[in-house]
A protein has these predicted regions:
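N-terminal leader/linker segments that precede catalytic domains of diphosphate-processing enzymes
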Residues: 1-89, 94-112, 116-140, 145-149, ...
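NUDIX/MutT-family hydrolases
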Residues: 154-184, 188-197
């Protein structure tokens, strides 16, 4: 039996389009960029050498409605991967060939890693690229949206588990923590690592920097919405 009131589905669709339209418009304007990213960057951060040639890579920041709130799918990377094993990340990877766009690569990786069909995703913009010294990549985050929660299917060897992360948590008080770690390759060089908490999993590094910029954009949209009331 359908317990939804008449027009509920239409109202939900209108709310979805309203948010997406405002987000698309904000992504077409100057982005928060490095200033926002650095709020979640390890300190001191490992930057690539000035003359380093970074290989292009892409990641999909996908937003979808679930349980009455917007969510982002994040993956805990499998233990057999070459880089960033066990870390929380967005679905993504390097471009397969020179003719592949970052949008195509992001959609392909999301399909391979978490089973999201590319034809269900509406690409609405890009965030600021993040250079990653450890893997030698320049990561281009791509923002996409789907109307409904995807039927996720995880790649067994690449993804240990899926985290459905609420967008609202990015701007909640107390969302950010930090810890100290010894910097890789040094005996005493300590880094302060900021992180978002995701049900006990810590989101740090490049993924946290991407989410920090997205959080700044969400904050802008929230402020604009309050100003219109």
């Amino acid at each position: 039996m359908n317990t939804e009131l008449p027009g509920t589905e239409h109202l939900r669709f209108r709310q979805l389009r309203h948010f997406v339209d405002h987000l698309r418009r904000r992504l077409s304007e100057p982005l928060p960029g490095l200033d926002a990213q650095l709020r979640m960057a390890p300190n001191p951060r490992m930057w690539p050498e000035p003359r380093a040639v970074l290989r292009p890579a892409a990641a999909l920041l996908l937003i979808y409605p679930h349980d009455g709130a917007w969510h982002i799918p994040l993956t805990v990377r499998g233990a057999t991967l070459r880089h960033h094993t066990g870390q929380v990340s967005l679905p993504g990877g390097r471009l397969d060939h020179p003719d592949e766009s970052v949008e195509q690569a992001a959609l392909r990786e999301a399909q391979e890693e978490i089973g999201v069909a590319p034809n269900t995703v509406e690409i609405i913009g890009r965030l600021t690229p993040v250079p990653i010294a450890v893997s030698g990549h320049l990561l281009q985050p791509v923002v996409g949206v789907v109307q409904d929660r995807p039927a996720f299917s995880l790649a067994a060897f690449e993804v240990e588990r899926l985290i459905e992360f609420p967008v609202a948590r990015l701007t909640e008080p107390g969302a950010v923590g930090s810890e100290q770690r010894v910097r890789p390759g040094t005996p005493r060089d300590v880094q302060v690592i900021p992180y978002f908490d995701a049900d006990g999993a810590r989101i740090w590094g490049a993924t946290a920097m991407v989410l920090a910029e997205f959080a700044a954009i969400v904050h802008d949209l929230e402020e604009a919405s309050r100003a219109r009331r």
